[in-house]
Design a protein with these regions (language model features):
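N-terminal periplasmic "start-of-domain" segments of outer-membrane beta-barrel proteins
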Residues: 26-61, 89
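Short acidic/polar hinge/loop motifs at secondary-structure boundaries
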Residues: 89, 108-136, 155
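Short strand-turn segments of transmembrane beta-barrel domains in outer membranes
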Residues: 138-141, 151-187, 198-208
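Acidic/polar loop-and-plug regions of large Gram-negative outer-membrane beta-barrel proteins
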Residues: 222-224, 230-291, 324-374, 437-444, ...
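Conserved C-terminal beta-signal and adjacent last beta-strands/turns
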Residues: 236-237, 276, 287, 531, ...
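Membrane-embedded beta-barrel scaffold of Gram-negative outer-membrane proteins
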Residues: 305-315, 325, 522, 528-534, ...
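Structural signature of Gram-negative outer-membrane beta-barrels, strongest in the C-terminal barrel
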Residues: 380, 392, 396-398, 404-408, ...
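Gram-negative outer-membrane beta-barrel transporters
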Residues: 395, 473-474, 582-586, 607-712, ...
Length: 794
């Protein structure tokens, strides 16, 4: 059934408060963007759902990355990772981004190369998001076959029916700023409707040398025709540049320099004798994203309509950007550090880097560089078509069947930007390129390309069918069953390792599929039980097909398989609600890559480990109580047990001939999965002191938190120790907001204080060789910090 976004928002809230008797489980569609958004309604859904409306998103947004707006959700761990603007990670039920599906208005936006999600490329979403639904475990969309941990479904704002304009600004104590303006035309003559949003971020985060310059925009244009037809156009983008903290810290370094320490920058002396900051880590990216959608609603068959709905969306994105990088043939830039006791201690001494480069004895071409600065450039063109139709059979059943095709064309290359006092860089094609010298000049200067020039072209196709059926006199039993088939073909091109005539690889292809289903039974007016399960035979990401860094297709590629199951109880009364869920997920035949410089019998090789299994299970609980509009209390708990389940042997192949070179054993059985806390507790309180004046606070505790690690590094049969266990920590945040009117102008003022207790804690980290604090490295979070701002509404 077609719903406007205002109704979507109402469903998101009301589904936890009352029994909705109408079926909105089948694709709820944005009225503004007219996209089948695969939003589920908790009143009738057999999935574990968390809905975050725009008010809550705005409360969480200031100074935070996009994933951090999904806070206080059991089983979800989202952090800023490095402390740099936009750099973020999210884990759901212990699974990383590769096992989390991200949908934008129902369209998958996770990368096809590795499943990764570069959140800084989507920072504009913070100001353009109307609601987020987190669907843990089995996702509601048949296009989310990587929804093992769960699905994050993002809904963007849309034009309102009446004219509306708002503007806002916030500032963080660390020095970050955001300003935005949002205008909606309201209904225009002949069925048109337009909304515009623009925003700008500037300043810096709490991390040293972390300047920000990021814009964002969203344009939405609707056209309503007669007889149930609509067209919608959206344009979304976020051109950004930000300095990064790209190197993790040790306990010793944090003790010396503090949690804001950033090893990626230093000081350089200018020609006039002044000193200026210079960094090795900066990212710039821009990904304009466009959609054009046609939707049709023929009306319900029991209301005189034909019972058909159809949605066709074409989308297109052009991505272009990159980041600072460096190449070295000796002592790397990071080894030139100001010593203790001097000004700038712990930071890069750029003058020493340049002096070391210039000290090399010149040859016929001049001074040969030991280090050079480069830009590592990457981009892609992404285009696709999503088409589905829904046939309703009264209020008892419906079937949704559809197709999705996507082409993903990528490229990456590296360009010299600074010779650092030398005259040239020697690109050793004889050793580095499979093609050898091949008539190329190894003497390189500023603007020349080195080391990398390749890309991939991938086609991905999915066909699916999804049915919902209600049974019983009061429709108290709801069944869901869906199946999908998927296939991919891909080729890789490489102009560094091959000639123009031989640049394309052979074609690689795989097929997969999924089956998912669920059942919900209403026990009474306020309570229900539900269960769901799924099985995925998932085509590996394209990085698995070309794991050797050249055009040789990896041998013996197999699909990953995922088996999921969940059982839950949901209670929703007028002022009280609760939900308890038990889940299990088995991930089989995971493929992982070793470091490119692992040494087997003194030969540097890279190997792929296949057949690793992991088992995640646990339970989650939510409770809430409210008294009219004056008080609301929420509490949650999540306890999991996530472990790797087997030891495996990996065959090492020659990277060019693919002939076997030997084997290596990996011992991971029983080790805890790292990178997210396996125990979480939390509570929040909201209290209305007076009309328009609200106070809120939230507390979270994270424990049983093991550091991230690569199972492929566990090649010692006697090394069975768990990765380093990061100390548990708790956070207390609070805020106050006031809303009112000055004449006809709406005004909202807010102030938030995060980490009130000034806790020192680690957000993310990597295990070391001793599995103890002496070899651990990670990212420490900010201490006590605040943000404040205002919003004006006309």
């Amino acid at each position: 059934m077609l719903k406007s976004l205002s109704l979507v928002a109402a469903v998101l809230v009301a589904s936890h408060l009352e029994e909705a008797q109408t079926d909105t489980t089948a694709s709820i569609v944005l009225d503004g963007s007219s996209i089948s958004a695969s939003i589920a309604n908790a009143a009738i859904s057999s999935l574990r759902l968390t809905d975050i409306n725009q008010e809550k998103l705005r409360e969480n947004a200031p100074g935070r990355t996009f994933p951090e707006m999904i806070r206080n959700v059991p089983g979800v761990y989202s952090t800023s990772e490095t402390g740099s603007f936009g750099d973020a990670k999210i884990n759901i039920r212990g699974f990383k981004q590769e096992n989390i599906s991200v949908l934008l208005n129902g369209i998958p936006i996770s990368g096809l190369t590795s499943g990764s999600m570069y959140w800084n490329n989507w920072m504009g979403l913070s100001d353009a998001t109307a609601a987020i639904q987190v669907q843990k475990g089995v996702g509601n969309s048949m296009l989310s076959d990587n929804s093992v941990g769960g699905t994050v479904n993002i809904l963007t704002t849309h034009p309102s029916d009446a004219f509306r304009a708002e503007a806002g600004w916030y500032h963080t104590g660390a020095g970050a700023n955001n300003a935005f303006i949002n205008v909606s035309s309201g209904a225009l003559p002949r069925g048109w409707n337009l909304s515009l949003m623009a925003a700008y971020n500037w300043g810096h985060t709490f991390v040293d040398c972390s300047r920000i310059s990021s814009g964002s925009y969203l344009v939405t244009l609707d056209k309503t025709f007669r007889q149930g037809h609509k067209l919608n156009f959206t344009a979304l983008g976020s051109p950004e540049t930000h300095q990064q903290r790209s190197v993790r810290l040790s306990y010793e370094e944090v003790g010396k320099y503090g949690a804001a320490y950033n090893k990626s920058w230093g000081w350089q002396t200018a020609e006039d004798g002044s000193r200026f900051q210079r960094t090795t880590a900066r990212n710039q990216y821009f990904k304009p994203y466009f959609t054009l959608t046609h939707s049709y609603d023929g009306g319900r068959s029991d209301d005189g309509g034909n019972g058909w709905k159809a949605f066709n969306t074409f989308y297109l994105a052009f991505a272009n950007g990159g980041g600072y990088y460096s190449e070295s043939s000796g002592s790397r830039i990071s080894s030139f550090i100001f010593p203790e006791g001097t000004e700038g201690a712990g930071q890069i001494d750029w003058d020493a880097v340049i002096a070391h480069n210039a000290a090399t004895a010149p040859d016929a071409n001049g001074i040969r560089a030991v280090n050079v600065m480069t830009d590592y450039l990457a981009g892609h063109v992404q285009a696709g078509l999503k088409s589905n139709a829904v046939k309703e059979f009264g209020d008892r059943a419906d079937i949704d069947f559809g197709l999705h095709w996507q082409i993903y064309d990528t490229w990456e290359k590296e360009r010299i930007t600074d010779l650092l006092g030398a005259d040239y860089w020697f690109e050793d094609y004889e050793k580095k390129s499979l093609a050898g010298l091949a008539g190329r000049n190894p003497v390189k200067g500023v603007g020349d390309y080195v080391r990398t020039y390749n890309g991939r072209r991938q086609n991905y196709f999915t066909a699916y069918a999804l049915a919902h059926c209600k049974a019983g006199r009061k429709r108290q039993l709801v069944f869901t069953l869906g199946a999908s088939l998927s296939a991919t073909t891909l080729r890789r091109w490489d102009l560094y390792n091959y000639s123009e005539a031989e640049k394309w690889s052979d074609r690689a292809s795989r097929a997969g599929g999924s089956v998912k289903g669920g059942v919900l039974y209403r026990l009474g007016r306020f309570s229900k039980i539900y269960a769901n399960a799924a099985y995925y035979s998932r085509v590996p990401y394209s990085s698995v097909f070309f794991s050797n860094g050249n055009n040789q297709i990896s041998r013996d590629i197999c699909n990953e398989s995922n088996s999921l199951a969940e059982l839950g109880y949901r209670l929703a009364g007028g002022s009280f609600g609760a939900e308890i869920t038990a889940y299990a997920a088995l991930w089989k035949n995971k493929s992982l890559f070793s470091s490119p410089y692992s040494t087997i019998e003194e030969d540097p090789v890279k190997y792929m480990v296949k057949g690793l299994d992991a088992f995640h299970y646990g339970f989650e609980a939510d409770l809430w109580w409210s008294y009219e509009k004056f008080v609301r209390i929420d509490a949650f708990a999540s306890v999991g047990d996530w472990r790797w389940k087997n030891d495996v042997s990996a065959t090492i192949y020659d990277p060019t001939t693919l002939q076997p070179m030997g084997t290596v054993n990996v011992y991971a059985d029983g080790l805890h999965v790292g990178d997210a806390p396996q125990t979480q507790l939390g509570a929040s309180l909201r209290f209305a002191l007076s009309p328009g004046l609200d106070v809120h606070a939230d507390w979270t505790w994270n424990d049983r938190f093991w550091a991230d690690f690569d199972p492929v590094t566990r090649t010692d049969p006697d090394d069975r120790e768990d990765p380093y266990r990061i100390p548990s920590y708790h956070l207390l945040n609070a805020g106050v907001s006031w809303s009112g009117h000055i004449r006809k102008l709406g005004l909202v003022l807010f102030l938030n204080v995060n980490n009130i207790l000034d806790s020192s804690y680690i957000e993310r980290g990597k295990d070391g060789s001793t599995h103890a604090s002496d070899s651990f490295t990670g990212y420490w979070a900010d201490g006590r910090n605040l943000n404040f701002g205002l919003r004006l509404v006309l």
